[in-house]
Amino acid sequence: MPENTVIRVEDLSFAYGNIPVLEDVSFSIKREDFVCIVGPNGGGKTTLLRLILGLLQPDRGSIRVLSQPPEAARRRVGYMPQRAELDSQFPMRACDVVLMGRLRNTKLGPFRRADRNTVAAALDEVGMADLAKRSFSALSGGQRQRVLIARALACEPEILLLDEPTANLDPLVQDEMNDLLNRLNERLTVILVSHDVGFVAQYVKTVVCVNRTVAVHTAESVTGDSIRELYGHDVRLVQHRHSH
């Protein structure tokens, strides 16, 4: 695999039972790319992320992540799922949530000072250092998303995978989140799933269109025709940048 390629997918197919989800998928992602995965509901976007993480195994074809099988590279990938399996009412501080991201990097026993230093740095990077001791349940939706991104950063990844990180956020908060992801992309490969088609050309470099098969475009080349072909109908391309 070329040195600047961090993910390579070749001739991949996957089905849940007899229901095909992905067929004959081949593409690659370069280091420090900013990638948005788009497509209709049920098109295979989240399944593709799970295959990249090694949580699912392809029926045919291969995936290499950082020149390794996905399950071997998982420690080098930070992941924020679409729905965090956290009870927002559980009495846990923001820093405790982020500390969970150190579990796979830490031997059995109490967390070390180095772990807590890494957590503090991750919270600072996402702009949440001042709220580190605040209860997770007391945070706003956007603040919780930042904490969950910090949790993904706490494992010191080379690739950041995010499933719908701006879902259900107000437009201004979405803009702030997108600016954060842009800054993270200065040192990390960032791959996210988004239903916000207007987000695509505004922030990202590469668009991976998923609807059973996969087509890869530069962000500048995404047009109404390509999106219509992907979704099967017209989709409004709305920009969310606001002035305040």
Stretches with model-predicted labels:
Residues L99, R113-L131:
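Conserved ABC ATPase "signature" region
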Residues L160-E164:
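Catalytic Walker B motif of ABC-type/P-loop ATPase nucleotide-binding domains
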Residues V210-L237:
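Conserved beta-strand-loop-alpha-helix hinge in the C-terminal portion
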